[in-house]
């Protein structure tokens, strides 16, 4: 017993010395004076928010979104920005690819007049800008598009064809060590968009890998794999893409959930269509034949007309969205069953979906 008391006194003295040297709060007991809830920002997709478990992307963390070309990576991040701006948050877009279309961003609901944008010349410059913005404590969301376009200064100044083995990986590794702590302190969400490459000589297993080395994989709290799985058609006209997102890593909730939704060209994620589907699944929206009803009132014949009704009555859509979020994100026990509404196994083939009721 005396030995235990001596240990407690020694521990208290050590904690006091640490706080005196490094400041109050530099060390604490995990359950003491802090919220265990993770603050999140919506992705713009209800089904993806459910699949993520915490209700969105976690603040103060690093997130990686990767996938093939034209799979919806930039669209998803622009939807995150739009959702954050609706909450009054400040966002920044680091356009390393020099390909951001402000007209398209505006169509997705982004307030381009209040969106900070940078088109850096080198990878080091892009990452220094990220660090400066996060240390300011005034920016809530930072998007980097993309890791593959973060070209080291030495490579830009060199000749085409010169070998620069491992330069990008070393640059990213150093940046991750520096950024991780600053992001946590400022509660800033940093999202990296990444591209896919093929590993040469892989006979077994997945030959796909992402650019920028392994540091980002380790430091990311959430990694999302986004794929286009088919086309959304209105008659013979292709009006969008069927999209599947898999949560391949998740440090704030259970990983390996999947979400499926539609991305409509010029409009973004079909959020109202998601509300209809989830509402029917959880018996908040009644479906009798082709007719959809909500609170006893018919809202449309066919999914397309029901979606139009919600678009014309935003207060009804907001009410249904709140009910679904309260039900499906009430506790962690609901995450698995809720995400399963949109869970399917990955398929290598890409289908065309003739969906006239988009």
Curated annotation (Swiss-Prot):
It holds the Pfam family RecA. Keywords: ATP-binding, Cytoplasm, DNA damage, DNA recombination, DNA repair, DNA-binding, Nucleotide-binding, SOS response. InterPro entries: AAA+_ATPase (IPR003593), DNA_recomb/repair_RecA (IPR013765), DNA_recomb/repair_RecA_CS (IPR020584), P-loop_NTPase (IPR027417), RecA-like_C (IPR049261), RecA-like_N (IPR049428), RecA_ATP-bd (IPR020588), RecA_C_sf (IPR023400). Its main location: cytoplasm. It is found in: Cytoplasm. One of its GO terms (cellular component) is cytosol. GO terms for molecular function: ATP binding; ATP hydrolysis activity; ATP-dependent DNA damage sensor activity; damaged DNA binding; single-stranded DNA binding. It comes from the Bacteria. ATP binds at residues 67-74. One of its GO terms (biological process) is DNA recombination. Gene3D superfamilies: P-loop containing nucleotide triphosphate hydrolases (3.40.50.300). PROSITE patterns: RECA_1, RECA_2, RECA_3. Belongs to the RecA family. Can catalyze the hydrolysis of ATP in the presence of single-stranded DNA, the ATP-dependent uptake of single-stranded DNA by duplex DNA, and the ATP-dependent hybridization of homologous single-stranded DNAs. It interacts with LexA causing its activation and leading to its autocatalytic cleavage. This is Protein RecA. It comes from Xenorhabdus nematophila (strain ATCC 19061 / DSM 3370 / CCUG 14189 / LMG 1036 / NCIMB 9965 / AN6).
